[in-house]
């Protein structure tokens, strides 16, 4: 009969590979989470800044119309319409996000 060896040196290369792979997966998973979270927040901030700029242009166009300083009423109307449409879109996106969040809260585990 052959003697059973309790020699762990035979398994050590495999255990090192397993540990290395686990560490790499954890690092890549953390990097993925940070990357995705960062992208969404950047996208959200960028969208809000664009909406703010559009609203400011609309306000300036309205002020120029009120004071008679504007030369092209058509461009002012376009700026105002663009701001109105952008605000409606942002509100709908917000409403959908809130609705999805509420749906998640109702989900039973």
Curated annotation (Swiss-Prot):
* Disordered: annotated segments: 1-38
The record ties this protein, via InterPro entries, to: FliE
Subcellular location, in the record's words? Bacterial flagellum basal body
Q: Which key words tag this protein in UniProt?
A: Bacterial flagellum
| A GO CC term assigned to this protein in UniProt | bacterial-type flagellum basal body
Cystine bridges: none
HAMAP family for this protein: FliE (MF_00724)
| Family listed | Belongs to the FliE family.
Record-given protein name: Flagellar hook-basal body complex protein FliE
Q: Which organism is it from?
A: Helicobacter pylori (strain G27)
Output the lineage of the source organism: Bacteria, Pseudomonadati, Campylobacterota, Epsilonproteobacteria, Campylobacterales
């Amino acid at each position: 009969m052959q003697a059973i060896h309790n020699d762990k040196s035979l398994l050590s290369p495999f255990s090192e590979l397993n540990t290395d792979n686990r560490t790499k997966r954890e690092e890549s998973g953390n990097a993925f989470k940070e990357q995705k979270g960062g992208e969404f927040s950047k996208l959200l901030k960028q969208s809000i800044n664009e909406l703010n700029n559009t609203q400011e242009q609309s306000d300036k166009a309205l002020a120029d119309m009120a004071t008679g300083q504007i030369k092209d009423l058509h461009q002012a109307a376009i700026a105002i319409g663009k701001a109105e449409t952008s605000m409606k879109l942002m509100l709908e996106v917000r409403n959908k996000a809130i609705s999805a969040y509420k749906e998640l809260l109702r989900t039973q585990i």
